[in-house]
Curated annotation (Swiss-Prot):
Belongs to the HIV-1 VPR protein family. It comes from the Viruses. Residues 1-42 are annotated as: Homooligomerization. This is Protein Vpr. The lineage of its organism: Viruses, Riboviria, Pararnavirae, Artverviricota, Revtraviricetes. The gene is vpr. Homooligomer, may form homodimer. Interacts with p6-gag region of the Pr55 Gag precursor protein through a (Leu-X-X)4 motif near the C-terminus of the P6gag protein. Interacts with host UNG. May interact with host RAD23A/HHR23A. Interacts with host VPRBP/DCAF1, leading to hijack the CUL4A-RBX1-DDB1-DCAF1/VPRBP complex, mediating ubiquitination of host proteins such as TERT and ZGPAT and arrest of the cell cycle in G2 phase. Pfam families: VPR (PF00522). HAMAP family: HIV_VPR. Phosphorylated on several residues by host. These phosphorylations regulate VPR activity for the nuclear import of the HIV-1 pre-integration complex. It is found in: Virion; Host nucleus; Host extracellular space. Keywords: Activator, AIDS, Apoptosis, Cell cycle, Host G2/M cell cycle arrest by virus, Host nucleus, Host-virus interaction, Ion channel, Ion transport, Modulation of host cell cycle by virus, Phosphoprotein, Transcription, Transcription regulation, Transport, Viral penetration into host nucleus, Virion, Virus entry into host cell.
Length: 96
């Protein structure tokens, strides 16, 4: 009869510690890119919707990830990641 292999991988930290660390990092990054009043409003909305639960933590993580992804994708002035078009000179030539 087959047996499942024993877990021989590296020891992982518990889910709740990992989740709170991820939230901390996302919040510190979000503060660099969005007005604090927006983030406060988002936090209030999450708290009113989910209360003080893990579902609320997971929801705010998901929303912050989406906001930051879109922010970088559109083109953040603080980052080299993005889709900002290069400005062309008036005669239409581009430098290559």
């Amino acid at each position: 009869m087959e047996q499942a292999p024993e877990d021989q991988g590296p020891q992982r930290e518990p889910y709740n510690e990992w989740t709170l660390e991820l939230l901390r990092k996302l919040k510190s990054e979000a503060v660099r890119h969005f007005p604090r009043i927006w983030l406060h409003g988002l936090g209030q909305h999450i708290y009113e919707t989910y209360g003080d639960t893990w579902a609320g933590v997971e929801a705010i993580i998901r929303i912050l990830q989406q906001l930051l992804f879109i922010h970088f994708r559109i083109g953040c002035r603080h980052s080299r990641i993005g889709i900002i078009q290069q400005r062309r000179s008036r005669n239409g030539s581009s430098r290559s």
